[in-house]
């Protein structure tokens, strides 16, 4: 299915990525390799990445399973508070992909683009910028719902 999605995006002239964890996860996985289809200039190229390619540890899916909204919020806040581990690595790696897709150099390979994105994702979390933005969104949401 991810190839069909990539073909549609290429036909529409979009640039970006479609990921599928080789363990069946619908995002970048820490549990082994991830198949990546890179779409650019109406062409599709295929690659595989592994968390280890970016200095991150592999981890089983069970290590990153969330829960209900409250549990997922708790996990997010703990990551933003500096907690290390598989959930943080999964968030950083998927954020790196989003950054690479949005701002990456189309001439560079996937690993180069994602490495640059990972540096920015780590900075956003470790500097407190991600937490600050989350707090702004929360305040805005509360303001809107109170109106």
For each predicted feature, which ranges?
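Glycine-rich anion-binding loops and their surrounding alpha/beta cores
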Residues: 1-147
């Amino acid at each position: 299915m991810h190839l069909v999605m990539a073909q549609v995006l290429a036909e529409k002239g979009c640039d970006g990525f479609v990921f599928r964890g080789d363990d069946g996860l619908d995002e970048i996985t820490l549990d082994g390799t991830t198949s990546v289809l890179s779409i650019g200039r109406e062409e599709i190229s295929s690659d595989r990445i592994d968390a280890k390619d970016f200095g991150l540890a592999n981890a089983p899916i069970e290590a990153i399973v969330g829960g209900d909204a409250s549990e997922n919020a708790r996990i997010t806040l703990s990551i933003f508070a500096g907690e290390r581990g598989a959930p943080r690595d999964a968030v950083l790696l998927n954020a790196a992909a989003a950054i690479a897709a949005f701002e990456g150099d189309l001439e560079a390979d996937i690993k180069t683009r994602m490495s640059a994105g990972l540096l920015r994702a780590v900075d956003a979390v470790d500097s407190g910028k991600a937490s600050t933005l989350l707090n702004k969104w929360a305040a805005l949401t509360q303001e809107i719902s109170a109106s």
